[in-house]
């Protein structure tokens, strides 16, 4: 049996400890001994980006925000889907996570981050949202397990009314706001609707045909056509 290697540790501003592991060529980030994400399971992250970005493929000068770099799969799927003139802003709060992805020895997202369309920001995505009123055609937030249960307490505001309104304010007309979640959450879905959004809830698996089910919330301002 091949050993599990602990490669590095990061601590977020609220004290959450993230640990990077490698096993048999696959990488994972763990919190409290539990995989938060893995290079073996990223179908739902790919699906999130494809659902949000495919309708924008023919739109000129598209601007997209991704909250949370993770292991780079949402970013890579967005870049595969969007046009050459698109701009993708990625906000990641943990400098170590950025470093892991940029490390060519780990084969994670170094090539994607070097893409000329990418604007990588070492910052809390909440700060980027506050500074970006009316700037994005789409916002994808994959910064935690979803509204409940949170692994990082500092992410809570993003799933509350104030955070949802902040994200909505950062959208351009006809913009999309999407969230990745490990679980379904009827209360969060209702919070999106209470903010004046129409919401599509999509269930998708960690692998293309197997693995745990994850939930994607894809929201738009009510009354706008697709």
Which stretches of residues belong to each language-model region?
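Active-site beta-loop-alpha junctions enriched in small/polar residues
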Residues: 182-184
